[in-house]
């Protein structure tokens, strides 16, 4: 069923970033609906809709920006510690990453902020030189870490940025 939805461009699957095709399929998977109305129609009422809508819009923008490359460049990343980075863009065949993106509705809660930053920090230690960004609803700034700076950008600004 999911393959048919992808073939019809109704939704897209995101797999774990791995050099092994088998491992990437077994370790993690997220599905993103192209039409957020479809997401709301098919998800349980308990789902946090705004958070999921923001994550979906970030994924669709990453996919739009990367449409010139190979299919599958935008992945998710399960870290050895069990933490997860929402999106990683890179070359799976060579095990290199260029962008690490976390999506967070708000970082007002210190535990949420620490969770998002620690996941990116761990990923930055595995992929030196990768740009790290946390996309939020309306917060901005920079967080300095031992592995480099993490940029915090509101979704509207991040979406409008010119990319190389």
Regions flagged by a language model, labelled:
Residues 67-69, 121-129:
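Arginine/glycine-rich "motif VI" loop of SF2 helicases in the C-terminal RecA-like domain
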Residues 106-125:
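Mg2+/Mn2+-dependent nuclease catalytic core
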Residues 1-97:
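Accessory nucleic acid-recognition modules appended to NTPase machines
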Residues 85, 109-112, 141-145:
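Short active-site-adjacent structural elements
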Residues 137-164:
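Domain-level recognition of nuclease-like catalytic cores that cleave nucleotide substrates
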Residues 90, 97-109:
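Active-site ExK catalytic segment of metal-dependent nucleases
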Residues 22-23, 124, 142-144:
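Short secondary-structure boundary/capping segments
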Residues 131-136:
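Short, hydrophobic beta-strand segments that form beta-sheet elements in well-ordered domains
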């Amino acid at each position: 069923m999911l393959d048919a939805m992808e073939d019809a461009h109704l939704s897209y699957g995101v797999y774990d970033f791995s050099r092994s095709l088998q491992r990437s399929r077994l370790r993690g998977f997220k599905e993103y609906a192209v039409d957020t109305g479809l997401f709301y129609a098919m998800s349980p009422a308990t789902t946090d809709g705004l958070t999921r809508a923001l994550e979906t819009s970030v994924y669709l923008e990453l996919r739009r920006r990367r449409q010139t490359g190979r299919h599958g460049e935008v992945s998710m990343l399960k870290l050895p510690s069990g933490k997860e980075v929402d999106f990683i863009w890179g070359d799976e065949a060579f095990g290199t990453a260029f962008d690490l993106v976390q999506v967070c509705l708000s970082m007002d809660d210190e535990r949420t902020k620490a969770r998002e930053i620690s996941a990116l920090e761990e990923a930055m230690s595995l992929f030196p030189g990768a740009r790290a960004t946390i996309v939020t609803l309306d917060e901005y700034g920079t967080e300095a870490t031992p592995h480099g700076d993490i940029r915090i950008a509101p979704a509207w600004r991040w979406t409008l940025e010119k990319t190389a």
